Amino acid sequence: MKKIVLLVTLVFSINYSFANASDDLINKIKNIHSMSASFDQKLINGGRASDNISSKGYMSLKKPKFFRWITTTPNNQEIISNGSKLWIYDGDLEQVIIKKVSNNIAQFPYLILLSKNTDNINKLFTVKELDKNTYLLKPKNDQMIDSIQIKFSDNENLEYLAISTSLNQFTKISFSDVKTDIDIDNNKFDFKIPDDTDVIDETKD
């Protein structure tokens, strides 16, 4: 009987710990109403240093639906969403792909930062608190992502986002010069297509 009680207590404690971690994470995300930052992104393919890819740029987001991700080095690439359309622009190729906004976090991990409630995160992930400001998210069903790690600074600014995939790829995005709760014009999240750009509009499919 004591073993059964101990087992039930252990299971309850684990479930409470996961729920508490999820609540803590979502509270931190909820506190980010708008944000801008510079980023340094490193992609490691299969653990081989020779295959590492680094990029830098800047980003901004504004709840409930606006997102802007500008890569400046080594190439000019832009990902911009106004909540209904998503533009993916490659300056070197002079090409823009227009998509409908997806809810697929595997494809667009930034969607976690726009989450408004625990239901979506709890439905998709098991959340574990690694330390006071670091959270590990393990997908319940997604086959593409192995895990997502999110770390906040002591003042609850986003410090880094790390993604491990089933393709043995690891991406770490470190943020600096973070500003939160700032006023950002909605027009910043509409993409103006440059002249002589090849347009692939997938919203009409």
UniProtKB/Swiss-Prot annotation:
Residues 1-21 form the signal peptide. InterPro entries: LolA/LolB/LppX (IPR029046), OM_lipoprot_carrier_LolA-like (IPR004564), OM_lipoprot_carrier_LolA_Pbac (IPR018323). Its main location: periplasm. Keywords: Chaperone, Periplasm, Protein transport, Signal, Transport. The keyword Nucleotide-binding does not apply. One of its GO terms (cellular component) is outer membrane-bounded periplasmic space. It comes from the Bacteria. It holds the Pfam family LolA. GO terms for biological process: lipoprotein localization to outer membrane; lipoprotein transport. It is found in: Periplasm. Belongs to the LolA family. Participates in the translocation of lipoproteins from the inner membrane to the outer membrane. Only forms a complex with a lipoprotein if the residue after the N-terminal Cys is not an aspartate (The Asp acts as a targeting signal to indicate that the lipoprotein should stay in the inner membrane). Monomer. This is Outer-membrane lipoprotein carrier protein. It comes from Francisella philomiragia subsp. philomiragia (strain ATCC 25017 / CCUG 19701 / FSC 153 / O#319-036).
